[in-house]
Amino acid sequence: MSITAINVRNQFRGTVKEIIEGPVVSEVDVITRSGDVVTSVITTRSVKDLGLEVGREVVALVKSTEVSIATL
């Protein structure tokens, strides 16, 4: 899958470093190409729906009020 257009300006490619799953929400740590870690709290259902797992390449999308993750 590729993203063809999106209105989020701040995008960071990276790799899922760690997932801490909870019953409702989960914490996903993404290590970027520069070595920085971006952490996102998303629903556990989204973790499963996106097929997120440690080592998976993702894009962290940072908007002023939220951080979203899109799979590649």
State the predicted function of each range:
Residues 1-72:
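Non-catalytic connector elements of ABC transporters
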